[in-house]
Amino acid sequence: MGNKQTIFTDEQLDAYQDCTFFTRKEILRLHGRYHELAPHLVPMDYTNDPDVKVPLALIVNMPELKENPFRNRIVESFSEDGQGNLSFNDFVDMFSVLSEMAPRELKAIYAFKIYDFNVDNYICKEDLEKTLNKLTKEELTPEEVNLVCEKAIEEADLDGDNKLSFADFENMISRAPDFLSTFHIRI
């Protein structure tokens, strides 16, 4: 007794449990991972809600992200500051949405944000080109990329505006059986 270090208050842990798909133990493990990224920045005591953000450059090098061609976009999509720097809340949100427990609808919202490179709330041909080039490590010719992107828009664009709205995107991924199994990260 007396030797136990308090990282979060019971109220904080309850709040994290209420708004994520994690148990108390998993939240504490996430804090450990967050602390490991920047031990000089991240305190072990979060009972006073410190205003700390771990830089994008440290987060994208986590083993769970470093091989993902969309790592920067993933982190930026969860960053409150829009620069890719993550507070602990942002970090927990990212892992919660990418957990196996998150529903398809929630994953779809963030997948759309990740693929919307120009942040105009549509996935246009240029967004698809960037996505395809990242997925294929730029091994396709410009003509092949163009053909695939045009075909994707033709098949998924329900209202004929030559870009994918969120509704178009959601309809498209509802027909992709592997979406849920590929859009996750284990902690």
From Swiss-Prot:
Gene Ontology BP annotations: calcium ion homeostasis; camera-type eye development; mechanosensory behavior; neuromast development
Keywords assigned by UniProt, alphabetized: Calcium, Cell membrane, Cell projection, Cilium, Cytoplasm, Magnesium, Membrane, Metal-binding, Repeat
InterPro entries in alphabetical order: CIBP, EF-hand-dom_pair, EF_Hand_1_Ca_BS, EF_hand_dom
Single GO MF annotation: calcium ion binding
Subcellular location: Cytoplasm; Cell projection, Stereocilium; Photoreceptor inner segment; Cell projection, Cilium, Photoreceptor outer segment
Ligand binding (Ca(2+)): D157, D159, D161, K163, D168
Span of domain EF-hand: 66-101, 103-138, 144-179
A GO-annotated cellular component: photoreceptor outer segment
Signal peptide as annotated in the record: none
Keyword Magnesium: yes
One Pfam family of this chain: EF-hand_7
Any coiled-coil regions, as ranges: none
Family matches, as Gene3D superfamilies: EF-hand
SMART domains: EFh
Observed phenotype of the null mutant: Morpholino knockdown leads to loss of response to acoustic stimuli. Approximately 80% of morphants are unable to remain upright while swimming. Decrease in number of neuromasts. Loss of neuromast hair cell bundles at 96 hpf and a reduction in extracellular receptor potentials of neuromasts.
Distribution of this protein across tissues and organs: Enriched in central and striolar hair cells.
Keyword match Endoplasmic reticulum: no
Other noteworthy facts: The binding of either calcium or magnesium significantly increases the structural stability of the protein in comparison to apo-CIB (calcium- and magnesium-free form).
Quaternary structure and interacting proteins, as annotated: Monomer. Homodimer.
Function of the molecule: Calcium- and integrin-binding protein. Plays a role in intracellular calcium homeostasis. Critical for proper photoreceptor cell maintenance and function. Essential for development, maintenance and function of mechanosensory hair cells.
Record-given protein name: Calcium and integrin-binding family member 2
Organism taxonomic ancestry: Eukaryota, Metazoa, Chordata, Craniata, Vertebrata
Gene: cib2
